[in-house]
Amino acid sequence: MRYITSLDPSSLNSSFLPDLLTQARRRIPTLQRSSPAFFLVPLLVSTTLGHAHQWVPHIYAFATSELPSPPPHSTTAPLREAAPLPKDETNPHRLVVRYMKEALAKSSCIIGAPRAIEALLELDKVVPVEAKDDSFVREELDQSRSNQERAEIGMKGISTVYQKDIVGIFNMMDPYLKDIRWFAQNITYGTYLAPHADKTPETSPDPFDQDSTLLSILTLSTIVPQRTPREILWHLRGAIRRGIPREQVRSLHEEIEVVCRACGVDNVREGISTVDDVDKQAEEQ
């Protein structure tokens, strides 16, 4: 894999990034018409590879470019008691921000908090006040969730990706990797990736629960750039299990490689498993 020096920020003022994002909108597979996948993939790949400070403003501008103008912010309007659930959000600009915020919050357990925080702060700089999102997705974790509940929710979330295979993976970890096993269940899934796996999409404050494919889009967009062979194979398989058709998983994997190349990282899939290495799954019957 060849690493290239960082992109010249001035190049982002030309047609390079808008063209890339336009192509991503066309090529990234989605099962839902209003899916945010077209901006989440470049957001997550660029943040994983350290380009958030250059890319985030352009990604936000592109993601909202075809939306109607947000309603004007009123300094006299009463504060909202609580952010509406994602399904009830009436401001499409704020919903875009919510998806971007939650994608970066989830990604921090995969790519590291510093890069996620950098991207979140860059996002906050460019979001106008009328599109600011004050949702607190994990508020319940502070209020009423016991450790046992968190473990159960984590197992429910992790099982949507690994199904019965998680038993063998956890058995492999148990002798010498008990901390990693605990983190995977309680923190990675129970707190970051699937904090409301026990809720229905209608009652969950997590926007990712509105579309079962988004979690796989997030995990692949953050682990493929890191070239972690086992995790990539597991999550290619998990994407099929979470409802993405095999050929769309292939297209997603290829598009992640395109964005990696634009970030200066070539051949990210070289020598790494592809969807062709995934056995036929029950969901494909």
Language-model features: locations:
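Alpha-helical oligomerization segments
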Residues: T203-Q285
